[in-house]
């Protein structure tokens, strides 16, 4: 069983890459989605466009459209570790290269709880046309679209 997670506010091709790797790597996937409360405590997530229920629905719609009928469960995340530290059947974590470092913390907690360590699979952060990361934050701010296309350019005033 594979776990992955995120806030999944403005869905984009980076989320698609993460989910693609998770579904390639495991027969069953647990997808953690940050609760509204947890997301509001995380840097750059204070202003979400969608509440938890909307984010779940949007993600389910994307999964059905892109992957068809795959075996997955959605878990509400109230902390950064979610079911990876409590559910013994998780074998692997698929995470962005930005968050894969949490895998070692997860494995430390799992060892303390006498659970076997999990494999960590890192997915590279996808870059927008300008070379910056594709992220929900940049989509919310109107800089880029979900595929990384530049929507606005800031100009320096002289």
Feature annotation, model-predicted:
Residues 1-158:
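Nucleotidyltransferase catalytic core that binds NTPs
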